[in-house]
Amino acid sequence: MGQSQSGGHGPGGGKKDDKDKKKKYEPPVPTRVGKKKKKTKGPDAASKLPLVTPHTQCRLKLLKLERIKDYLLMEEEFIRNQEQMKPLEEKQEEERSKVDDLRGTPMSVGTLEEIIDDNHAIVSTSVGSEHYVSILSFVDKDLLEPGCSVLLNHKVHAVIGVLMDDTDPLVTVMKVEKAPQETYADIGGLDNQIQEIKESVELPLTHPEYYEEMGIKPPKGVILYGPPGTGKTLLAKAVANQTSATFLRVVGSELIQKYLGDGPKLVRELFRVAEEHAPSIVFIDEIDAIGTKRYDSNSGGEREIQRTMLELLNQLDGFDSRGDVKVIMATNRIETLDPALIRPGRIDRKIEFPLPDEKTKKRIFQIHTSRMTLADDVTLDDLIMAKDDLSGADIKAICTEAGLMALRERRMKVTNEDFKKSKENVLYKKQEGTPEGLYL
């Protein structure tokens, strides 16, 4: 009995041993497998990518991006299928609109007739029709005034801009930028005509004080008249070469326009540009195209020509002074011009260009043969003393034809026979027949 009490363990002793075992220190579960790697330092650290261990959050992001990629692929496939199903005409229209957006749309030019309010106006186009249109908000309203040129949308004709320089392109072409090569030395004879045009056109522009001291007003314009080929246009070219003033050249037929009112408008633009670039000279060749005598006509074209001439009369001697703007006109038929056009006050000097006399013919022949290689037997006296009505243009044609005949026969010198044959050819073509004595 005593043995069992001293040597045996009771139930209370077993519980005590279990408590001692639980109190023992247990190390935490390591969170990283393997040894801790040392951080690399130095220049090689930037080139190495950091190690990313897979986590739950990264896995979710990857799945989300893959899902978005699938959606984008589905959308791309859907758009591709829709493009294939689209009709051919609709596809071409869309491509055409893209091309138009890239290269821009053209704009038409109109004239502002009247401003209704801040957002609306009445404009007219080149075809003569008027439109009630809107003014877009980005247009500078301070630049809008009746009569100015505006840019219009080609579909709705809305005002989308203002042209600052509203000069007609036809007037810009009329302005002579480069002076002609002809000078007074290239004109044979015509000494009196040269003196008169210098007194009427050049001196008032270069030395206006001479006329102020004399107490007279300089001539406003001159008209050059005479047979064809007598040097009227040549003298005008020499004036453009000698003077430093702006030279505007226009042919009378250019002032005849297709639409109603364009001819008078072109005349106004011509003189407005001349005043802006004063001192200037306006040369109107073949003035008889618009300056013929007025008469009652039922033709709309004839009435438009007469309105153009009336505008020219107003510009020559109207209410406003033209300043340093001189006018030179040229015509072959002065007897057909309207008396109001060539009266004093508008055209103060009428300069006649007759056919050349013997002295003038000799000078013209000398000018045109100065650069030609002539044979020893050439005597121009027979051509000069002839009673044929030769103009300066005819003499130039004779010299040119003689040179061509020598060139045809491979000769470098022009003989007297060449001049005789060339004269016969020129007279034959001029008279449109056979001259007398050709076959005698």
From Swiss-Prot:
Species for this entry: Homo sapiens (Human)
One of the Pfam families matching this protein, by short name: AAA_lid_3
The protein's name: 26S proteasome regulatory subunit 4
Binding site for ATP: 226-233
Family annotation (Gene3D superfamilies): 1.10.8.60, Nucleic acid-binding proteins (2.40.50.140), P-loop containing nucleotide triphosphate hydrolases (3.40.50.300)
GO molecular function, a single term: proteasome-activating activity
Positions bearing the Glycyl lysine isopeptide (Lys-Gly) (interchain with G-Cter in ubiquitin) cross-link: 237
Record: disease: Birk-Aharoni syndrome: An autosomal recessive disorder characterized by failure to thrive, severe developmental delay, intellectual disability, spastic tetraplegia with central hypotonia, chorea, hearing loss, micropenis and undescended testes, as well as mild elevation of liver enzymes.
Start and end residues of each stretch annotated as Disordered: 1-49, 84-104
